[in-house]
């Protein structure tokens, strides 16, 4: 049975941890508001670019732009994985890394068996995890979320485009956490390259636009902007989902600490009561012995 001193030491440690988790929850909540606003603001622009690209692709020969042209055979696959730089965010990283493994081992098992699956990892957790397990991580961006800006997303998009154009990848897949709500993150996979209109964009593509100077010239300008914007949107979504996951995890840890403190206080009071009872019994026994 633990002594009173042992329980006091444990109580002190748990109370200290509770203060840390409570502070981290408050910090994550503040960061979540900013991250959520940025993610939501990026969605309309990214969606409109995708809609315009879908409209243009119906008016030009897509084979003239290699980033719009699917390959006859998909022999090489590039997976762009977005995780976080730090932990203490529940299952945020573990779940998305499991999804990435499932995509590689199930959807592209043949390519993986030939060593033809490469990865770009944004975030320290993903790059560390997959490099330790022998995956081909061609480029990592550790610390990217410590100061998240558009230039990082642009660099990733340009690298993916170059690898696709050089034939180092026949398909580029994005794997990330999409922000839905604080309690419901959404694991997502999207095809980045070749660019293909999603379901429902065909109707939007029917909208009539007047193009100057020409659809071909505009699409050449629009494609890189679209890629940069999509990667930027994905990173903003992931950042917001990370802060939501961390806030929820720290809230749960704080509540667990509160419950543990309650249980330990009960144990402490019982142990203290038992010690007092024992001392009283010894005093009474000593007094009786003196009377005899």
From Swiss-Prot:
Gene3D superfamilies: 3.40.1380.10, ATP synthase, gamma subunit, helix hairpin domain
Any single GO CC term annotated in Swiss-Prot or TrEMBL for this entry: plasma membrane
Any GO molecular function: proton-transporting ATP synthase activity, rotational mechanism
Cell compartment(s), UniProt: Cell inner membrane
Record's keyword terms, sorted: ATP synthesis, Cell inner membrane, Cell membrane, CF(1), Hydrogen ion transport, Ion transport, Membrane, Transport
Superkingdom as given in the UniProt entry: Bacteria
A GO BP annotation: proton motive force-driven plasma membrane ATP synthesis
Major subcellular location class: membrane
Membrane-related topology note: Peripheral membrane protein
Statement: the UniProt record of this protein carries the keyword Ion transport: yes
Pfam families per the UniProt record, alphabetical: ATP-synt (PF00231)
Protein family per UniProt: Belongs to the ATPase gamma chain family.
Self-association state and partner proteins as the record states: F-type ATPases have 2 components, CF(1) - the catalytic core - and CF(0) - the membrane proton channel. CF(1) has five subunits: alpha(3), beta(3), gamma(1), delta(1), epsilon(1). CF(0) has three main subunits: a, b and c.
Function summary: Produces ATP from ADP in the presence of a proton gradient across the membrane. The gamma chain is believed to be important in regulating ATPase activity and the flow of protons through the CF(0) complex.
Record's protein name: ATP synthase gamma chain
Gene that specifies this protein: atpG
